[in-house]
């Protein structure tokens, strides 16, 4: 079954919520995207005479017809909170201080009329200048919060927490064992690794990139675990797998999970405990800095495919940092843009 929520779209310009659009929605089962398209075209009355590469199978298509609905999913599917646009001001066309600046976005329904040559040039307005000046912000009040417990004896080791549900109160007991200095050090020294905390049986780990496979060698020194200097494999790296856009385009969840299993094997071979991947942001532009790390412009496809790849990686005992799932679209000047 497919949740009805999967058929919704975010209406950024009118309602500002997730909507069910009026009309027919088609679901099909097929071996690949081409066969899926042919199935739906067949339901619409098309044949190979209309340019299809092969006849589709109308019996494999389910059609659901809806009236326009901007109410049912005006609250978040998972939390029940009101759906609001947090970043409307990032759109020049909706930013109140844009002045005469406008941007024309590409549209598949009017491709020739919306493709504009050259880079978009914007003129600085006074309000834009004022809004981008960094200002001090008041820290939120700590009223109502309790200082955490540190260094409380409990005799729990990290391995005891394997498989314990995230909401289990045993985690509170486990965390209360740690001292302030231990927590400060693990936070301050966490770039592509985590430090050891011997008192709870936590080893030092190597956690490294990336979304297309491991980037480090199985070698001496800082790259991976140490090996014999005469080991003929010491400078070998793991496989670089196809970029995530290509992986998602297969729409083959079983194959994607197998890719994850292979990445997990490579990660163990390179001495990884954790992988800085996968990339969960969505494609907003072909010129974004991390397009190769992300799966799709479709959030549903991104989530479904990534889940299977993550399951594959973690089946080998390698934990996954699902990273860059929001606000990471630009590499140029990335350190200077807030």
Predicted regions and their residues:
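Glycoside hydrolase catalytic-domain context in secreted enzymes
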Residues: 1-10, 21-28, 33, 81-338
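Terminal connector regions
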Residues: 3-86
């Amino acid at each position: 079954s497919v949740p009805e929520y999967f058929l919704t779209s975010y209406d950024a310009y009118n309602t500002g919520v997730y909507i069910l659009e009026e009309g027919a929605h088609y679901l099909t089962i097929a071996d690949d995207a081409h066969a899926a398209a042919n199935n739906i075209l067949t339901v619409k009355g098309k044949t190979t005479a209309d340019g299809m590469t092969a006849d589709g199978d109308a019996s494999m298509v389910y059609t659901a017809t809806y009236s326009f609905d901007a109410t049912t999913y005006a609250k978040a599917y998972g939390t029940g909170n009101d759906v609001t646009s947090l970043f409307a001001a990032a759109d020049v066309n909706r930013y109140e201080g844009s002045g005469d600046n406008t941007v024309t976005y590409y549209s598949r329904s009017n491709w020739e009329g919306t493709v504009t040559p050259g880079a978009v040039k914007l003129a600085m307005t006074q309000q834009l200048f004022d809004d981008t000046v960094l200002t001090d912000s008041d820290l939120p009040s700590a009223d109502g919060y309790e200082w955490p417990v540190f260094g409380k004896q409990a005799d729990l080791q990290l391995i005891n927490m394997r498989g314990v549900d995230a909401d289990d109160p045993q985690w509170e007991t486990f965390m209360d064992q740690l001292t302030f200095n231990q927590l400060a050090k693990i936070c301050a020294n966490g770039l592509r690794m985590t430090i050891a905390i011997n008192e709870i049986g936590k080893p030092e780990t190597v956690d490294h990139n990336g979304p297309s496979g491991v980037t480090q060698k199985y070698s001496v020194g800082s790259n991976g675990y140490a090996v014999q200097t005469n080991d003929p494999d010491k400078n070998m790296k793991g496989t670089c797998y196809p970029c995530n856009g290509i992986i998602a385009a297969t729409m083959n969840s079983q194959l994607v999970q197998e890719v994850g299993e292979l990445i997990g094997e490579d990660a163990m071979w390179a001495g990884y405990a954790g992988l800085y991947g996968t990339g969960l942001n969505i494609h907003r532009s072909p010129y974004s800095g991390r397009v190769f790390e992300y799966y799709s412009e479709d959030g549903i496809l991104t989530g479904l495919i990534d889940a299977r790849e993550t399951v594959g990686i973690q089946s080998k005992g390698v934990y996954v940092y699902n990273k860059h799932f929001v606000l990471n679209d630009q590499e140029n000047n990335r350190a200077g843009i807030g």
